[in-house]
Amino acid sequence: MEGFNIGGKSLKSRLLVGTGKFASYDLMKQAIEGCGTQVVTMALRRVNLDHKEDNILEYIPKDTILLPNTSGARNAEEAIRIARLSRAMGCGDWVKIEVISDQKYLLPDNEETVKATEVLAKEGFIVLPYMNPDLMIAKRLESVGAAAVMPLGSPIGTNKGLQTKEMIRILIEEIKVPIIVDAGIGKPSQAAEAMEMGAEAVLVNTAIATAQNPVKMAKAFELAVRAGRLAFNGVTAPQAKVARASSPLTGFLHEGEA
Amino acid sequence: MSFYDTYLEYENFDTEGFLKEVKEPDVLGIIKKNKLNHHDFLALLSPAAANCLEEMAQRAQELSLQHFGKTVLLYTPLYLSNYCVNRCAYCSYNIDHDIKRKKLTYDEIEKEAQIIAETGLKHILLLTGESRIETPVSYLVEAVKIMKKYFDSIAIEIDPLEKEDYQRLIEAGVDGLTIYQEVYDEEVYKQVHLAGPKRNYHFRLDAPERACEANIHNVNIGALLGLNKWQHEAFMTGMHANYLQNKYNDVELSISLPRIRPHVGGFRDVYPVTDQDLVQVLLAFRIYLPYVAITMSTRERGSLRDHLIPLGVTKMSAGVTTEVGGHSDSDKGDSQFEISDTRSVEEMRKAILNKGYQPIFKNWMAI
């Protein structure tokens, strides 16, 4: 499958994986390795360098790109501080901006996300902002240097799929940097749907981590993402509202014909 | 406007009459709802709901997986002092009790911190009895400065403070507040808090809100189950959490379900709370407030705590001693109450893994 580009890096896998909520780090590692993902996101606030068994970095394959996220940040200032700390801890230049000030629905704060993205992009970070799909905000994120834009399909952890489908479709049409659908994807079929629409990639966590068999589910997502991308490239056949054969309004013209 | 206004709305509500009217089909219908109202929540505490515990458990597990996954955060309390100026009928620290009093020096605090840190824990809860003279905010600020060398997350469980004092502690490095109302019923509150500043019901009730206004990161509340009818106390606790969450969106809320434990003193006027009651309360909290963390302390025995993990518990204490200086085994002060689950951090880590859950040592860091 053809690759895509984020921040100058060419990626083959279009499935990004999140690391929260797994029953163990061993299981998480197996899921990551099994699905061939090249980008793995983890909450920097959870990175525990002092404790080998609790240190998530020990379980992420070395050839994977780390995408530390700013989970826990309630405003731009906190997100910026976490990103800088992440770089100082040796977690690289990639960062997923998560600014969430609503602990109930965990919806992102778009305004603060733009502010953090602007500052960090100027500092040379590869910034992937998680956002509520909104065209004007996505354009601003793009203009201030986001390497990709990550709209939510539905709220984090809900597994409700592409509830924001129409907004994501507009972002895919209008935004030049990659659109990566993040949050809410609950089933491989929903990931495939996002890919069929033309998303460059998807990020999945809860649906894999809390599946009965996370390793199998990660593999299923990999296949679904590939299938969806193939379908996008193959350009799906157009839909018709009525069967072509029937002509309920003009059929009378043919009455009496053999 | 404070939570007291909400409390007043329900002060004369016929809770028992309402609970009697709830039928099992009502409960099964409520479980399926996306958003529960106050009465739905109360219905989950009814006798009819007690007959639907398995259905409630299935729903609670589903919601816990969605919001928290298969993870349990580990922390431990560190008792700094058992000096107290209050006369609480149910507490060993009661000023009238002849227990061995002790306050840790800064050197002793550091020694305790070093020993706890060796277990790998990164979250610590600092506790004191309530004495502004023995443990003023300045003492706590110094203790927090020492803790910062060893721990990523520092919470406090101390006497209620003014907003400015919470701000001082937050600036020093505190990110969490635990404060139990003990009992929400105002009359019962007066009966069990015989003397001392803790008798001020309102100052305690509004303490979590003052901490929220001071921009604290997380708040843990609860009622001491056993001081009053558990249905009433669980209902008010849930309502309080809901009030705080709606008003302070960015604060992470937790609820604890402490049951009264053996202690020094003669208070025996306890309303029984069985294991089944405790499970019902836990499930009702999870279904009503799927996004709040739920803490289960070592007051409960190990086997029960293990069974509660898949039902929605997200935080557990481990390696606990409630004695002042209890970790470093030096000259200890007497404990606040007897714990039940005496497992070490390593034993708890293994127990959580055995349940198919991931023990988390670090979930937060001061930024």
From Swiss-Prot, chain A:
What keywords were assigned to this record? Cytoplasm, Schiff base, Thiamine biosynthesis, Transferase
Pathway it belongs to?
Cofactor biosynthesis; thiamine diphosphate biosynthesis
Family annotation (Pfam families): ThiG
User: Which Gene Ontology BP annotations are present?
Assistant: thiamine diphosphate biosynthetic process
Positions that bind 1-deoxy-D-xylulose 5-phosphate: 157, 183-184, 205-206
Q: Does the keyword Cytoplasm apply?
A: yes
Q: Record keywords: Cytoplasm included?
A: yes
User: Which E.C. number(s) belong to this protein?
Assistant: 2.8.1.10
Write out the GO cellular component annotations: cytoplasm
> Quaternary structure?
Homotetramer. Forms heterodimers with either ThiH or ThiS.
Q: What is this protein called?
A: Thiazole synthase
Q: What is the protein's species of origin? A: Alkaliphilus metalliredigens (strain QYMF)
Gene for this chain: thiG
